[in-house]
């Protein structure tokens, strides 16, 4: 009986460890996606600005680069 209790506790700790690893990996991936979206939007701003003005320095200022 004591062995089954020990196995049960071990399985609970293992499940908790796996859950925390997965949740931390997901949060890191979300941070990477957020930074990519900001970079993507910034590049789109510069592209549109360059199409209208043709002045890279002005576009850098306008797009906060």
Swiss-Prot record:
Q: What is known of its domains?
A: Has the structural arrangement of two alpha-helices stabilized by disulfide bonds (CSalpha/alpha 2(S-S)).
Signal peptide as annotated in the record: 1-26
* Expression (tissue specificity): Expressed by the venom gland.
Q: What is this protein called?
A: Potassium channel toxin kappa-KTx 2.7
Q: What is the lineage of its organism?
A: Eukaryota, Metazoa, Ecdysozoa, Arthropoda, Chelicerata
Source organism per entry reads Heterometrus petersii
Q: What disulfide bonds does the UniProt entry report for this chain?
A: 45-63, 49-59
- Propeptide stretches in the record: 27-39
Name the Gene Ontology molecular function terms of this record. Answer: potassium channel regulator activity; toxin activity
Cell compartments where the protein resides? Secreted
As for what it does, the entry says: Weakly inhibits the Kv7.1/KCNQ1 channel (10 uM of the toxin inhibits currents by 17.8%).
Task: Please provide the record's keywords in A-Z order.
Answer: Cleavage on pair of basic residues, Disulfide bond, Ion channel impairing toxin, Neurotoxin, Potassium channel impairing toxin, Secreted, Signal, Toxin, Voltage-gated potassium channel impairing toxin
Q: Name one GO cellular component term.
A: extracellular region
What is stated as this protein's family in its record?
Belongs to the short scorpion toxin superfamily. Potassium channel inhibitor kappa-KTx family. Kappa-KTx 2 subfamily.
């Amino acid at each position: 009986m004591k062995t089954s209790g020990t196995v049960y506790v071990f399985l609970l700790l293992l499940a908790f460890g796996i859950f925390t690893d997965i949740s931390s990996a997901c949060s890191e991936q979300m941070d990477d996606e957020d930074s990519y979206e900001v970079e993507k939007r910034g590049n789109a701003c510069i592209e549109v600005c360059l199409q209208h003005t043709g002045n890279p320095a002005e576009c850098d200022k306008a797009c906060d680069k």
